[in-house]
Structures are given as structure tokens and as C-alpha cells.
């Protein structure tokens, strides 16, 4: 009899390409001012990470005006807090750094897990049922781009 050794299959994970390659397709890197950046983070948003990620994937690497239009027309509940966050980041960039809103470009839009709020729901016969409400942190980074006229 031949015995076979069972080996756990480990798939190879491809490294993600850097975001600058994606950015280079939309905006030439010579026009992107790397150090002219504004960050805005919102913490403990009562929303699943996956629901927020679906919206953030649509707005990443887009201009501010285009992003606002997309978020206004999206049918998802997750788009409203993200819209407020993008508005706030653009207002901060315009007020504190004197950036023009027409030249703002979203270079970073990421979501991370936050704490899970645990509650208990009373059930029949004196039992209780756990309810887990997930929360997330969302970070937006806006760069200024020199547009060619």
C-alpha cells in the first residue's frame, strides 16, 4: 500500500499593485502635488465595513465634484455618511489650506473595523439573544491637482 502525505494547500497571494499606477491612468503624476494633501477621518460610524467598502470603491481616484454627484445618486444607505465626510474634507481644504474645490482629487479612501457594540434582546422563557452591531472608521485623503487649461 502506498501512503499519501496530506499537505495543506496554500494559495499564492498576488501583491496588490500600488495605487499610483491607477492614479497615473487618470491623472499624470507630474500634475499631482504629492505633499498638498488633506486627511479627514470619521470614527465609529454605525455601519458594516463591507457596506462602506462597496461605496468607497466607487469614489476612489475621482475628482471631488464627480464624487459628490456619484454619492448623491447612489441608492445605498452607506453613501450619506461618506458624502458628509467628503464635504467636510473639502471644506477643510478650502478653509484652512486655501485649495480650490475644483482641483481636489480623492487619492485615499479606506475603511477599517471598529469595535462591535453588543446588546441583548429578551426572548421567550427568560432567555436572551445577543445582537452585534458593527462599526467602522473611514479615512479620506484629498490631493490638489493642477488641471491643464
From Swiss-Prot:
Disulfide bonds: none
Transmembrane spans: none
GO cellular component, one term: chloroplast
Keywords: Chloroplast, Plastid, Ribonucleoprotein, Ribosomal protein, RNA-binding, rRNA-binding
Assembly and binders: Part of the 50S ribosomal subunit.
HAMAP family, A to Z: Ribosomal_uL22_B
Family designation: Belongs to the universal ribosomal protein uL22 family.
Function, as annotated: This protein binds specifically to 23S rRNA.
Protein name stated in the entry: Large ribosomal subunit protein uL22c
Species for this entry: Brachypodium distachyon
Gene that produces this protein: rpl22
